[in-house]
C-alpha cells in the first residue's frame, strides 16, 4: 500500500470510529419516563422490549467499535513498519561466490564414482 492509501484508510477509520462512538453514546442516553400512568402490564412489556432492543443495538455498536479499533491498530502497525523499513539502508549483495565451484564439482564426481562402485559390487 502506498503512503497516501494508508493515510486515507487511517482517516476513514478514524471517522468511522468517531461516528460509531457518537451513535453508541446516543443509544445509551436514557429518556425521561412518563410516570403519570399507573404502570400497566402492556407498558412494562413495551419498555422491556425497548430496553432489550437498545441493549442489542449497544452490543452491536460496541462490536463494530472494537473491530474498527483493531483495523486502526493494523493500519498504524503497517505505517510504522513501512516507516522503519524505509529507514534501513539497502545493502548490495556481493557477487563473489562463497564456494569454490571446482572443488564442489570434484566432490560431486567422487561421490558419484563411490556410489556407482558400490552398486556394481
Curated annotation (Swiss-Prot):
GO biological process: positive regulation of transcription by RNA polymerase II; positive regulation of transcription elongation by RNA polymerase II; positive regulation of transcription initiation by RNA polymerase II; RNA polymerase II preinitiation complex assembly
Keywords recorded for this protein, A-Z: Acetylation, Activator, Nucleus, Transcription, Transcription regulation
InterPro entries xref list: Med22 (IPR009332), Med22_Saccharomyce (IPR016530)
Family in the record: Belongs to the Mediator complex subunit 22 family.
Stated name of the protein: Mediator of RNA polymerase II transcription subunit 22
Keyword Endoplasmic reticulum attached: no
Gene Ontology CC: core mediator complex; mediator complex; nucleus
Additional remarks: Present with 2181 molecules/cell in log phase SD medium.
Organism whose genome encodes this protein: Saccharomyces cerevisiae (strain ATCC 204508 / S288c) (Baker's yeast)
Major subcellular location class: nucleus
UniProt modified residues of type N-acetylserine: 2
Alphabetical list of Pfam families matching this protein: Med22
Quaternary context: Component of the Mediator complex, which is composed of at least 21 subunits that form three structurally distinct submodules. The Mediator head module contains MED6, MED8, MED11, SRB4/MED17, SRB5/MED18, ROX3/MED19, SRB2/MED20 and SRB6/MED22, the middle module contains MED1, MED4, NUT1/MED5, MED7, CSE2/MED9, NUT2/MED10, SRB7/MED21 and SOH1/MED31, and the tail module contains MED2, PGD1/MED3, RGR1/MED14, GAL11/MED15 and SIN4/MED16. The head and the middle modules interact directly with RNA polymerase II, whereas the elongated tail module interacts with gene-specific regulatory proteins.
Amino acid at each position: 500500500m502506498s503512503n497516501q492509501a494508508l493515510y486515507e484508510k487511517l482517516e476513514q477509520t478514524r471517522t468511522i470510529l468517531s461516528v460509531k462512538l457518537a451513535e453508541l453514546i446516543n443509544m445509551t442516553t436514557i429518556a425521561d419516563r412518563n410516570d403519570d400512568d399507573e404502570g400497566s402490564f402492556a407498558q412494562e412489556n413495551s419498555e422491556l422490549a425497548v430496553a432489550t432492543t437498545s441493549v442489542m443495538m449497544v452490543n452491536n455498536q460496541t462490536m463494530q467499535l472494537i473491530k474498527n479499533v483493531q483495523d486502526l491498530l493494523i493500519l498504524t502497525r503497517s505505517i510504522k513498519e513501512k516507516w522503519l523499513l524505509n529507514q534501513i539502508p539497502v545493502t548490495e549483495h556481493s557477487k563473489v561466490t562463497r564456494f569454490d565451484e571446482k572443488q564442489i564439482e570434484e566432490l560431486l564426481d567422487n561421490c558419484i564414482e563411490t556410489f556407482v562402485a558400490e552398486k556394481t559390487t
